[in-house]
């Protein structure tokens, strides 16, 4: 009986330790379960290392796989994804999940192909600095009543969206062989009252019900909006509406683009927060700061050195690990572009976000540093079940060092997370750590933190059969169980590393590289010490263990490509590669290891497969010459693109046409929409009648053109108030004569002006006031007074000096809510004449009557022009060369400029506001091998006129790539069709 009990307990320990885990489930599936330590997928614990990705902000589906491969290569095993209602629904009852980037099935397929799980976040409200927070724009005009409550009017609008998108999510759940493991309900919705009948509780119940109706069975989650409330946790005042996995969002950096000494203050109360409010659940951060957005008039992302610094992930993400977080999602990991009119007014065209992966899809040092954490968590299974042993400044020989001490109760593995107690400190501090190990108390010597640096020191760390690291002052990057157990350490150059292997006698070893290893004896065995030299050092021990000692720069170029497509990668399911810029994947076939990747410059490559049958290395399909090292790796050279000359065409053959013919008094607007409403569903009353809110007439995104008529020569002016978002300007003309307006302000959503008609020619009858308005997006929910319902367009227009307007008409994007360009979608275009006529689309034939002027010539007064040109590119097929357009304007220029590449609005340039003047285009929007149609619209906000002084194509980095960036993108670039009905 005792033997049976022992075997039973042993089996139970295996099932609940490193093997299969039984945890709490939601009663719908056991494929995804949880306990207070971590999430488990298919019975195996998982450290969820996730990155936020918004497919809408990269409208080329093929490039989603490019991004996913880069995330997987850099240690991620999941993506978190918003699904924006606004992107898929141009009008009520219509949903597009088929055309171009609207085909989200491809998103799930690519995620699965890349080996990434998916956390689905379909709202219905998302926020995300996107227009109206992701609400369909046709609904964001007041008709939903009290949004984000149980209001019946709101329910009737959002329910069809969640049902439709939910069915696709359900189809792709892990229970159906797909990648979806979690499904978020709503977004940052603070539970204000713990009352089962409260409207928010009822609303969350409604969301759960509709998702269930759609077929969702994976666990539900939610994201708390910082430490401001406690919402929807089953462990705290659960009166209904609670989700399975509680999450806490946090953006603690407080960093400044212009002041490198500001912020950098760690939050060290996450652990207590989760213990208080979600103690039976794993600690989950659905959004942790991966960067920060920048507003109109702010800084451009490339200048934000503090946000871009690799110090940030090193210190902040490791602090989260020390706080026992085991579900960690970085917002953003790839930001992308607010192309078209998809941005909320708080951001400009770029949504780079200072994220680890640049808007151009280039890998920043920030991502390289993040990879070191991702690869560590991927193999460190003991980290998935720990308790907080303690924390504070008493663990080291220097009280300026703060320590988190985590312990695995089953294996005794220890994880000590170290950082300066004052997290913003830049001191170089050397100290020893008082650690608890299976060999007793050990003082681990010569640990150095170089300013804003953090380290995870491990003890009793198993890295394979009969291989345990008793301790190490060098950080573990990863390990592999191949023909031998391979352990990978990293340190800064010049820092000291000391480690000991558990239960091992003094081992003979051979060193290959610049780091000299010495030994010393102690009560717990042999201690191996070294000072990290430059580059890579390999140490081969007589017991078979192979250790790589990497400096940080070498670690940044170290990869562990999996040989499995599963997001869960065991230590025997990856190989080790050092050297290139990117390793996308690897496989072993018939004695050859085949590696795909990218390289900027020619580099060496070292490959360790642990397979003696592997004699050759192929890089992007081509065999490279290699030599075998004494410790079993293969070393060769892979080519880069440093010698490639990128020759971009000059843009000197332009045609121009008038894009504001509506300012002329005899313009025929008889087919325009008549503004005749005297009431609005919007809760905000207009300042005058008729209602001139653009949304009330079916025009939502982009430029709007209004024409108001009045009689009499005695009218002295007009008082006009326009609200189209922060920085949005407007201009007005009377009978074709400039009358004034506003250049907009980054701090104002609405601007007013008293237009003076003195000196302007008026008629007895039928004078025309033309008002052209820019647009920077619909507000998010948090903006007063009514969030997404804050109207767009003219809030009020009255005449001074007597009389009233006799009529108003409005024109916006061609077709309004008809979505006449379903590939590019409902937010791509506005109401400028050139847009309505499709002058920006490929295949448009410019008439001979067009002038041969360019944006450098500009306009001399308050006018508008639409400039078009074509050019060809012929980049090498194996190159990834991000291309952008650099604009500039003379100081003092006040104008609204838009950039269209092959029909996509990929730039909104306000030279008087900034900050953005460089606009990148992803392949698929631009043709790297073929013809391109470039259009620029420009209208002056004052009678001083406007012109540009720089319009040139620029190349970013150059990379030899194993990814096909030069495909036929024709299906994403539908061409011109006659649009004369929208004049």
UniProtKB/Swiss-Prot annotation:
Read off the Pfam families from this record.
Answer: BetaGal_ABD2, BetaGal_dom2, BetaGal_dom3, Glyco_hydro_35
Q: Tell me the residue numbers annotated for binding substrate.
A: 82, 127-129, 187, 251, 353
Keyword check for Disulfide bond: yes
Stretch forming the signal peptide: 1-23
Q: Which cysteines are joined by disulfide bonds?
A: 257-304
Looking up InterPro entries in the UniProt record yields: Betagal_dom2, Betagal_dom2_sf, BetaGal_dom3, BetaGal_dom3_sf, BetaGal_jelly_roll_dom, Galactose-bd-like_sf, Gly_Hdrlase_35_cat, Glycoside_Hdrlase_35
Reactions catalysed, semicolon-separated, are: Hydrolysis of terminal non-reducing beta-D-galactose residues in beta-D-galactosides
Q: What does this protein do?
A: Cleaves beta-linked terminal galactosyl residues from gangliosides, glycoproteins, and glycosaminoglycans.
- Name the species this protein comes from: Neosartorya fischeri (strain ATCC 1020 / DSM 3700 / CBS 544.65 / FGSC A1164 / JCM 1740 / NRRL 181 / WB 181)
Q: Listed GO molecular functions?
A: beta-galactosidase activity
Is Hydrolase there in the keyword field? yes
Major location (coarse): secreted
At the top level, the lineage of the source is Eukaryota
* Any GO CC annotation of this UniProt entry: extracellular region
Please give the family membership noted in the entry.
Belongs to the glycosyl hydrolase 35 family.
User: Could you identify this protein by its name?
Assistant: Probable beta-galactosidase C
Q: Which UniProt keywords apply?
A: Carbohydrate metabolism, Disulfide bond, Glycoprotein, Glycosidase, Hydrolase, Polysaccharide degradation, Secreted, Signal
Which SMART domains does the record match to this protein? BetaGal_dom2
């Amino acid at each position: 009986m005792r033997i049976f009990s022992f075997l039973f307990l042993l089996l139970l320990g295996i099932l609940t330790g490193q093997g299969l885990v039984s945890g709490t489930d939601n009663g719908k599936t056991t494929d995804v379960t949880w306990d207070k330590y971590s999430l488990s997928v298919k019975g195996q614990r998982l450290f969820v290392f996730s990155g936020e990705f918004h497919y809408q902000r990269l409208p080329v589906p093929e490039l989603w796989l490019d991004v996913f491969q880069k995330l997987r290569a850099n240690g991620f095993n999941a993506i978190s994804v918003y699904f924006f209602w606004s992107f898929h629904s141009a009008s009520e009852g219509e949903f597009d999940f088929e055309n171009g980037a609207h085909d989200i099935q491809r998103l799930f397929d690519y995620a699965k192909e890349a080996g990434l799980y998916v956390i689905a976040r379909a709202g219905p409200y998302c926020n995300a600095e996107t227009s109206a927070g992701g609400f369909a724009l046709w609904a964001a005009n007041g008709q939903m009543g009290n949004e984000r409550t149980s209001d019946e009017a709101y329910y009737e609008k959002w329910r069809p969206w969640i049902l439709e998108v939910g069915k696709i999510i359900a189809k792709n759940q892990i229970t159906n062989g797909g990648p979806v493991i979690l499904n978020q309900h709503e977004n940052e919705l603070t539970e204000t009252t713990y009352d089962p009948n409260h409207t928010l509780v009822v609303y969350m119940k409604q969301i759960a019900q509709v998702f269930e109706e759609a077929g969702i069975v994976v666990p539900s989650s939610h994201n708390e909006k910082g430490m401001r409330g406690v919402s929807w946790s089953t462990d705290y005042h659960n009166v209904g509406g609670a989700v399975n996995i509680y999450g806490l969002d946090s953006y603690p950096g407080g960093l400044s683009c212009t002041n490198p000494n500001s912020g950098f203050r760690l939050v060290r109360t996450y652990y207590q927060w989760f213990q208080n409010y979600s103690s039976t659940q794993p600690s989950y951060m659905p959004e942790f700061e991966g960067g920060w957005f920048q507003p109109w008039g702010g800084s451009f992302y490339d200048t934000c050195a503090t946000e871009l610094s690799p110090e940030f992930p090193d210190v902040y993400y490791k602090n989260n690990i020390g706080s026992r977080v085991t579900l960690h999602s970085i917002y953003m990991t790839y930001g992308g572009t607010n192309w078209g009119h998809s941005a909320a007014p708080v951001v400009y065209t770029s949504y780079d976000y200072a994220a680890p992966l640049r808007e151009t899809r280039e890998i920043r040092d920030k991502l390289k540093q993040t990879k070191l954490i991702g690869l560590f968590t991927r193999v460190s299974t003991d980290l998935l079940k720990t308790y907080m042993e303690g924390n504070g400044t008493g663990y080291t020989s220097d009280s300026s060092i703060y320590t988190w001490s985590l312990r695995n109760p089953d294996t005794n593995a220890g994880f000590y997370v170290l950082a300066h107690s004052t997290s913003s400190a830049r001191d170089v501090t050397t100290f020893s750590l008082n650690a608890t190990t299976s060999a007793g108390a050990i003082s681990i010597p010569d640990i150095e933190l170089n300013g804003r640096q953090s380290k995870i020191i491990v003890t009793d760390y198993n890295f394979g059969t009969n291989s345990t690291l008793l301790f190490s002052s060098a950080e573990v990057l990863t390990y592999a169980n191949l023909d031998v157990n391979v352990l990978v350490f990293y340190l800064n150059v010049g820092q000291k590393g000391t480690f000991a292997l558990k239960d091992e006698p003094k081992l003979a070893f051979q060193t290959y590289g610049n780091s000299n290893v010495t030994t010393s004896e102690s009560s717990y065995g042999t201690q191996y010490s070294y000072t990290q030299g430059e580059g890579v050092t390999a140490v081969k021990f007589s017991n078979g263990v192979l250790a790589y000692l990497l400096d940080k720069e070498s670690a940044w170029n170290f990869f562990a490509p999996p040989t499995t497509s599963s997001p869960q990668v065991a230590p025997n399911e990856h190989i080790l590669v050092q050297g290139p810029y990117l390793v996308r994947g690897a496989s072993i076939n018939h004695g050859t290891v085949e590696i795909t990747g990218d390289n900027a410059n020619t580099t060496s490559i070292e490959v360790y497969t642990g397979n003696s049958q592997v004699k050759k290395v192929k890089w992007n399909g081509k065999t490279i010459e290699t030599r075998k090292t004494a410790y079993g790796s293969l070393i060769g050279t892979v080519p880069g693109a440093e010698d490639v000359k990128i020759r971009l065409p000059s843009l000197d053959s332009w045609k121009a046409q008038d894009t504001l013919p509506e300012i002329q008094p005899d313009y025929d607007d008889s087919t325009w929409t008549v503004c005749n409403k005297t009431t609005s569903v919007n809760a905000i009353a207009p300042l005058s009648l008729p209602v001139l809110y653009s949304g009330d007439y079916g025009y939502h995104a982009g430029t709007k053109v209004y024409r108001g008529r009045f009689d009499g020569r005695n009218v002295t002016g007009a008082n006009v108030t326009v609200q189209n978002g922060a920085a949005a300007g407007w201009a007005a003309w009377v009978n074709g004569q400039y009358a004034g307006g506003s250049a907009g302000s980054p701090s104002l959503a609405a601007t007013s002006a008293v237009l003076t008609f003195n000196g302007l020619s008026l008629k007895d009858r039928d004078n025309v006031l033309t008002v052209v308005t820019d647009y920077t997006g619909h507000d998010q929910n948090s903006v007063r007074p009514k969030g997404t319902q804050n109207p767009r367009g003219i809030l009020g227009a009255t005449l001074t000096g007597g009389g009233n307007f006799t009529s108003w008409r409005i024109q916006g994007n061609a077709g309004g809510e008809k979505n006449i360009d379903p590939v590019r979608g409902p937010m791509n275009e506005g109401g400028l004449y050139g847009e309505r006529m499709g002058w920006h689309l490929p295949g448009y034939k410019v008439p001979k009557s067009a002038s041969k002027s360019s944006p450098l010539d500009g306009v001399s007064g308050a006018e508008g022009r639409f400039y078009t040109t074509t050019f060809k590119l012929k980049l090498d097929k194996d190159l990834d060369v991000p291309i952008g357009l650099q604009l500039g304007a003379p100081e003092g220029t006040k104008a609204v400029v838009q950039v269209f590449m092959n029909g996509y609005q990929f730039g909104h340039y306000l030279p008087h506001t900034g900050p953005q003047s460089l606009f990148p285009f992803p392949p698929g929007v631009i043709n790297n091998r073929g013809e391109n149609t470039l259009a620029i619209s420009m209208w002056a906000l004052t009678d001083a006129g406007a012109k540009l002084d720089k319009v040139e194509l620029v190349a970013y980095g150059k990379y030899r790539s194993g990814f096909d960036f030069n495909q036929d993108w024709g299906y994403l670039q539908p061409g011109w069709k006659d649009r004369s009905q929208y004049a």
